[in-house]
Amino acid sequence: MRVGVYPGSFDPITKGHLDLIERAASKFDKVIVAVLININKKGMFSIEERVNLIEKCVAKYNNVEVKSFNGLLIDFVRKEKADVIIKGLRSVTDFEYEFQMALMNRELANEVETVFMVTSPNYSYISSSAIKQVASFSGEIKNFVPKEIVEDLEERIISLRGEG
């Protein structure tokens, strides 16, 4: 059984993330979306909320699970008995960083491979950070995030602005 782990903050999940999850789900027996708990970062959504939002988006896939983790990614991958780390690449800059991380993970666990998946061109400019910035200035975000979470994101933006 081929198990892939797709790690990230997903704050919020984007159409680019979902595209990668869908494509990975067609290539692996099981895909675990691993939501990173980063205590040094104040997210827009709590870890539990991010897991729930992603679960809404991937509910139609029988072979996709969503879990949170903290600590080393490689420890989580081993615990889940996965053999592949899935990483999305939007640019050469992404590759340079992810290549270094893949080498480090390979050194820590040579039985685990890193698979790079190139982002679909129509999503290559989308990032969670950019979406948060657009939303903070009342910009339209529905073209950037899965339809299942547009309302959740809009409600959160309103509450953060103190309008709700």
Curated annotation (Swiss-Prot):
Residues annotated for ATP binding in this entry: 9-10, 17, 88-90, 98, 123-129
Q: In which pathway does it act?
A: Cofactor biosynthesis; coenzyme A biosynthesis; CoA from (R)-pantothenate: step 4/5
Reaction catalysed by this enzyme: (R)-4'-phosphopantetheine + ATP + H(+) = 3'-dephospho-CoA + diphosphate
Which cysteines does the record link by disulfide bonds? Answer: none
Q: What does this protein do?
A: Reversibly transfers an adenylyl group from ATP to 4'-phosphopantetheine, yielding dephospho-CoA (dPCoA) and pyrophosphate.
Give the NCBIfam families listed for this entry: coaD_prev_kdtB, cyt_tran_rel
Top-level taxonomic group: Bacteria
Protein's UniProt keywords contain Nucleotide-binding:
yes
Which EC number(s) does the record attach to this protein? 2.7.7.3
Q: Which cofactor does it need?
A: Mg(2+)
**Which protein is depicted?**
Phosphopantetheine adenylyltransferase
Q: Hey, which family's this protein in?
A: Belongs to the bacterial CoaD family.
- Protein location: Cytoplasm
Subunit relationships = Homohexamer.
Annotated binding of substrate, by residue: 9, 41, 73, 87
GO-annotated cellular components = cytoplasm
What is the organism of origin for this protein?
Clostridium perfringens (strain SM101 / Type A)
Q: Which GO terms describe its biological process?
A: coenzyme A biosynthetic process
